[in-house]
């Protein structure tokens, strides 16, 4: 799961992300997506690894027909020895742009691909009921190895 199309688009266009309305964010995402994929291509090609791009929305993973199509695409890419770079399709997504959360989409992609493991990297220490940086009432969820 990737992220950063809007941020890279803002950088290229010298825009402040906080001042963008939804429709402008979607346009900026399409500019930044090319920048993002170029960075991935440059990095992976150093190791002679082939990549592809898959742009999804949460709806794509939750509607049965589209979910099956996505699953088949992943399977075929794996068979072709390509590494799919997945990003939220911010050019058509709405709620995800507002909340900036790819975790649910990453979880759905892990389910679709029958992944053995999903590792979410974060700058937050722990698992919370909601984003503790935005919500003061966020509560830490205590886990034990039994839960994991």
Go through the PLM ranges and name each one.
Residues 17-93:
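Ligand-binding beta-strand-loop-alpha-helix segment within the catalytic cores
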Residues 8-10, 31, 35, 49, ...:
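Conserved active-site and cofactor/substrate-binding residues in soluble primary-metabolism enzymes
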Residues 5-9, 61-62, 91-93, 125-129, ...:
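Short, active-site-adjacent cap segments at secondary-structure transitions
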Residues 1-9, 51-53, 85-87, 120-122:
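Short beta-strand segments at enzyme active-site cores
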Residues 146-148:
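Conserved small/polar residues in nucleotide/adenosyl-binding loops
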Residues 3-24:
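Glycine-rich loop at the start of a catalytic domain that most often binds anionic cofactors/ligands
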């Amino acid at each position: 799961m990737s992220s950063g199309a809007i941020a890279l688009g803002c950088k290229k266009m010298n825009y402040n992300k906080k001042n963008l309305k939804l429709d402008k964010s979607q346009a900026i995402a399409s500019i930044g997506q090319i920048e993002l994929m170029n960075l991935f291509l440059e990095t992976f090609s150093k190791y002679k690894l082939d990549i592809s791009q898959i742009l999804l929305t949460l709806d794509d993973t939750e509607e049965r027909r589209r979910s099956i199509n996505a699953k088949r695409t992943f399977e075929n890419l794996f068979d072709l020895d390509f590494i799919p770079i997945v990003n939220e399709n911010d050019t058509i997504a709405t709620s995800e742009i507002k909340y900036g959360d790819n975790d649910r989409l990453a979880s759905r992609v892990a389910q679709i691909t029958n992944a053995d493991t999903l590792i979410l990297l974060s700058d937050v220490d722990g698992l919370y009921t909601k984003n503790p940086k935005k919500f003061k009432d966020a509560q830490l969820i205590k886990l034990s190895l039994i839960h994991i």
